Structures are given as structure tokens and as C-alpha cells.
Amino acid sequence: MADLLAMSTNIIDGHAAPGELGPLNRINHQLSELGSELAVVEAFSHCIVFKTDDGLVTFDTSNEHGGKKCVGAIQSWTKDPFNTVVFTHGHIDHVGGCGAFCAAYEGRKPTIVGHENVAARFARYRMT
């Protein structure tokens, strides 16, 4: 697990140039805890996870190939079920992994939240 907060602080405070700390957009599917109730999984499009009393709230699900890896990383952190998946936008690299999140807990599917135009984008994906 990388100390993402320390890495970003070093860059913001001018102690290191971005390239000195290695790649900034790493695709390693590793979970880093940012707080006791907050984590990020580094993926093609990162997955942000919040623990709530109702279950996990996630922002984005990565792509189709990364979704299962993101779910696995999250389940190594907590066994809490997914309650809500929020799409920041409808690009396939942010929403393509949703199937893995929906299948993670048999009998319990998360609520999906996204902009009203996401449905039209999905229809276009199905056509192409």
C-alpha cells in the first residue's frame, strides 16, 4: 500500500517533482487507506470507497477488465457490501467494472447513481 497522502504532500509542498516519485497514475489495483472510512484503489480510473452505516459507497468502478480486481482489493479491506455506486461520468473506463460490483454480494445489488445522460451513453455503447 502506497502512502498516497505523503506522495501528494511532497509534490504540493515542492519537496519532490512529480516524476521523482514514480508514475502518478498507477494501474496496480492496490487499495490505499486514506482514513479509517476512506480508501482508493489505483486503477485505470481510480475507485474511491467510503464506509457508511448502510454499506460501501464507491465512486467509479474502473473498466471491465479492472472491476473484479478493484472488488477484490476492496474486499481485502472490508467485508461490508456495496450500497451505492456513483458514476462521476459515463466513460467506459469509469463504469465498465460495475458488473463486478453488482455481482460481489449475492442477493444484494447496489443502487447506481449517475447523471441523466449516462443512460444515453450506455445505449450508444450497446449499439457500437
Regions found by a protein language model. Name each.
Residues 31, 65-113:
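Active-site metal-binding motif and surrounding structural segment of the metallo-beta-lactamase
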Residues 45-46, 63-65, 90-94, 118-120:
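Solvent-exposed loop/turn segments at secondary-structure junctions
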Residues 52, 61, 86-89, 99, ...:
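Glycine-rich, histidine-containing beta strand-loop boundary motifs that form or position
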Residues 9-10, 25, 38, 87, ...:
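Residue-level marker of intrinsically disordered, low-complexity segments enriched
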Residues 2-15, 116-128:
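Acidic/polar short surface loop at catalytic or gating sites that assists cofactor/ion binding
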Residues 25-79:
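Conserved beta-strand hairpin/beta-sheet module of binuclear metal-dependent hydrolase folds
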